[in-house]
């Protein structure tokens, strides 16, 4: 049974959402969850869930908590007994196979890189985002915020890591990998994308060339590569569009009697539609290139988000993603020597 260490004090709704998500995961996913946080607080929350004693859940005490206002440096250097750091340490020490936190993103990344270490061959770990498409198959975007400034070589590594993730976790047989730019032609883009293009072309991946922002939801590409600045903007725009679309749809349906009747008749279909757009269904963003695996949840994660983040962490570990990343980057390094 895989064991996942969960930062029970991270996120806007901690520890309630974290504990409920852990209970759901332990009860349905066949994984053990270690809740890391202030023991009395976490235990009190856990006692609210009937049957929790029969589930593979353990509590590990951590006296400190990293807040959303803490800098990454403060989280790493000053709060040595934070729930975030203790959870990461459990992975480093082999007590858990994955680390999940919905806390301060910068602090989680800094903690995971320092405590767990980086996979050999990886220059910079990258955050991967998963998005729905019109074709039904999800697309992944790498990087969505870990590295705002990137080199062409880093984008090439992101392409390799995204390809491996898509194959092993999303089960795409031959993922189509595209480089995000402002035009499909090879010469389009900025200095970074033009320099990265031939590097991606030389890789053992199904590189389809440049793709544009509109391709992100079309379903004609499986992995999109970009620097973390552009990726994070795309992520936040997507979240805003989903919120706006849900609001406008609800207002339109509630505006007239016929709309209300239509809503009642199509409630099941609309529920499934909302589910496809709900970021909580995707759990969290894997930090690719960190030893042991690290999944970073949205700060507003609810119990469903936490459960799915634990699921992603278990799939990541079970799919041996890091092992394949290390092997492929080692091969590329030798080929370049």
Curated annotation (Swiss-Prot):
One of its GO terms (molecular function) is phosphate:acyl-[acyl carrier protein] acyltransferase activity. Keywords: Cytoplasm, Lipid biosynthesis, Lipid metabolism, Phospholipid biosynthesis, Phospholipid metabolism, Transferase. GO terms for cellular component: cytoplasm. Its EC number is 2.3.1.274. One of its GO terms (biological process) is fatty acid biosynthetic process. Pathway: Lipid metabolism; phospholipid metabolism. Disulfide bonds: none annotated. The keyword Transferase applies. It is an enzyme of class 2 (transferase). It is found in: Cytoplasm. The keyword Calcium does not apply. It holds the Pfam family FA_synthesis. Coiled coil: none annotated. Catalyzes the reversible formation of acyl-phosphate (acyl-PO(4)) from acyl-[acyl-carrier-protein] (acyl-ACP). This enzyme utilizes acyl-ACP as fatty acyl donor, but not acyl-CoA. Homodimer. Probably interacts with PlsY. NCBIfam families: plsX (TIGR00182). HAMAP family: PlsX (MF_00019). Belongs to the PlsX family. This is Phosphate acyltransferase. It comes from Solibacter usitatus (strain Ellin6076).
């Amino acid at each position: 049974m895989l064991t996942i260490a969960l930062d029970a004090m991270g996120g806007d709704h901690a520890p309630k959402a974290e504990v409920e998500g852990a209970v759901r995961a332990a009860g349905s996913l066949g994984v053990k969850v270690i809740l890391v946080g202030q023991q009395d607080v976490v235990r009190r929350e856990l006692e609210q869930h009937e049957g929790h004693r029969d589930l593979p859940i353990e509590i590990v005490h951590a006296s400190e908590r990293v807040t959303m206002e803490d800098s990454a440096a403060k989280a790493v250097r000053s709060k040595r007994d934070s729930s975030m750091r203790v959870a990461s340490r459990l992975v480093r020490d082999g007590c858990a196979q994955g680390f999940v936190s919905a806390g301060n993103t910068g602090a989680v990344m800094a903690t995971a890189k320092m405590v767990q270490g980086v996979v050999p061959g990886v220059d910079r770990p990258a955050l991967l985002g998963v998005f729905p498409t019109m074709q039904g198959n999800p697309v992944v975007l790498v990087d969505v915020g870990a590295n705002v400034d990137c080199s062409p070589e880093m984008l090439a590594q992101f392409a390799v890591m995204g390809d491996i993730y898509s194959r092993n976790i999303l089960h795409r047989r031959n993922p189509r990998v595209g480089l995000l730019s402002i035009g499909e032609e090879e010469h389009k883009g900025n200095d970074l994308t033009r320099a990265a293009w031939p590097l991606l072309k030389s890789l053992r991946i199904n590189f389809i060339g440049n793709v544009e922002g509109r391709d992100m939801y079309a379903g004609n590409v499986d992995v999109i590569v970009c620097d973390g600045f552009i990726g994070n903007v795309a992520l936040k725009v997507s979240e805003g569009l989903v919120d706006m679309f849900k609001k406008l749809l609800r207002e339109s349906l509630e505006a007239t009697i016929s709309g209300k009747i239509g809503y009642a008749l199509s409630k099941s279909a609309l529920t499934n539609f909302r589910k496809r757009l709900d970021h909580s269904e995707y759990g969290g963003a894997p930090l690719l290139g960190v030893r042991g695996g690290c999944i970073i949840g949205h700060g507003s994660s609810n119990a469903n988000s936490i459960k799915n983040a634990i699921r992603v962490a278990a799939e990541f570990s079970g799919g041996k993603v890091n092992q394949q990343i290390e092997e492929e980057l080692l091969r590329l390094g030798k080929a370049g020597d």
